[in-house]
């Protein structure tokens, strides 16, 4: 991590009380960053985070400032903006079933809220903004994915405007299932096992990309360091079937049985991290892909070159065709998370 880039700088994290915000704090607290601003609408989570900092890291608590607001409210985000150098935009409605039942709430937060953040950033002269997206934005079939796909296009449009003004660099990251983030399935499986109940599986043949929270932060940092305006960054990720993921959790925590409950509203059999169309513009950067922005304007005639043909990529990059982990590989993967490690320690302490 290029900590020197953040020396004496101010970083604003929208949705900062979530799993991503907690992990960013863990990465940055001991560095020479000037200030971290946590922007969110939940005062209880902010209070919990503040007490956690004062209890565990009192020497760094002064670096962190809390702002109560909502990305839906343009003025509240503007109030948090003075003096900000960089932004990690993580505020979102992300639960697929909730967005299916309340799609306009997803529109308000994921689309309009993102536009509010980016307009405020451009007007305030913020240097760099990294926005967090999800694989559900690629070939979307549900309200969560559709709103996030629109969010991405809002990002690209604002990135184009900011670049034309010679100002803020705006880019996007897209990642798959972040293990043990809030609302994800591994904590649910663990809670069900510890309660002595069977774990509930939607479809054992579903596949999902797997990455831990540290990898999510690493992806954002890679994008921060390498982005041109409007770029999309994707981490190369392993995948697992939901059935193997359940077996991996049972191998670590115990087998209390399994109930297959069927797919929920808006769920896919597999997820796509990069579409065929995006692969045409992608650059392999080792552990990551960069998808360059399409910076053409609407005057297409000037982009036509006689004899030039672009061939479509063979396939999308999906959780079905990426490297598939078996049960043992999935066990090793989920053991990279602090959540699973801590849950295992708690179980051992209860037995002692």
Annotate each language-model stretch with its function:
Residues 66, 106, 170-173:
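Hydrophobic/aromatic anchor residues within beta-strands of the central parallel beta-sheet
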Residues 9-31:
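N-terminal Rossmann NAD(P)H-binding glycine-rich loop of SDR-like oxidoreductase domains
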Residues 32-48:
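Conserved glycine-rich Rossmann-like NAD(P)H-binding loop of the short-chain dehydrogenase/reductase
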Residues 40, 67-68, 108, 203, ...:
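Conserved residues in the N-terminal Rossmann fold of short-chain dehydrogenase/reductase
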Residues 65-86:
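Conserved Rossmann-fold cofactor-binding substructure of NAD(P)-dependent oxidoreductases
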Residues 89, 93-149, 157:
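Conserved Rossmann-fold NAD(P)-dependent oxidoreductase catalytic core, especially the SDR/UDP-sugar
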Residues 14, 81-90, 131:
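Rossmann-fold scaffold of SDR-type NAD(P)-dependent oxidoreductases
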Residues 3-5, 157-352:
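Strand-loop microenvironment adjacent to phosphate/nucleotide-handling motifs in alpha/beta enzyme folds
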């Amino acid at each position: 991590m290029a900590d020197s880039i953040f020396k004496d700088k101010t970083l604003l994290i929208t949705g900062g009380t979530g799993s991503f915000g907690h992990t960013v704090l863990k990465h940055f607290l001991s560095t020479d960053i000037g200030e971290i601003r946590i922007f969110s609408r939940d005062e209880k989570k902010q209070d919990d985070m503040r007490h956690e900092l004062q209890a565990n890291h009192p020497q760094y608590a002064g670096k962190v400032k809390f702002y109560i607001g909502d990305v839906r409210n343009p003025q509240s985000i503007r109030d948090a903006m003075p003096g900000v150098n960089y932004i990690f935009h993580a505020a979102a409605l992300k639960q697929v079933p909730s967005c299916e039942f309340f799609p306009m709430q997803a529109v308000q937060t994921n689309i309009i809220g993102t536009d509010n953040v980016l307009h405020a950033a451009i007007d305030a002269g913020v240097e760099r903004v990294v926005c967090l997206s999800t694989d559900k934005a690629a070939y979307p079939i549900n309200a969560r994915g559709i709103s996030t796909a629109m969010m991405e296009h809002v990002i690209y449009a604002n990135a184009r405007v900011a670049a034309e003004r010679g100002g803020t660099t705006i880019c996007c990251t897209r990642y798959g299932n972040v293990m043990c983030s809030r609302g994800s399935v591994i904590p649910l499986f663990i809670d069900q096992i510890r309660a002595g109940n069977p774990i509930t599986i939607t479809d054992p043949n579903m596949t999902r990309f797997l990455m831990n929270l540290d990898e999510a932060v690493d992806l954002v940092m890679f994008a921060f360091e390498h982005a041109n305006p409007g770029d999309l960054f994707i981490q190369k990720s392993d995948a697992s079937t939901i059935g193997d993921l359940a077996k991996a959790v049972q191998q670590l925590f115990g087998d209390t049985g399994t109930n297959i409950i069927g797919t929920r509203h808006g769920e896919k059999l597999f997820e796509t991290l990069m579409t065929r169309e995006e692969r045409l513009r992608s650059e392999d950067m080792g552990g990551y892909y960069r998808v360059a922005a399409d910076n053409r304007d609407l005057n297409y005639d000037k982009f036509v070159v006689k004899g030039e043909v672009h061939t479509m990529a063979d396939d999308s990059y999906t959780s079905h065709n990426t490297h598939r982990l078996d049960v043992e590989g999935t066990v090793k993967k989920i053991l990279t998370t602090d959540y699973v490690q801590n849950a295992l320690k708690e179980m051992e302490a209860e037995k002692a």
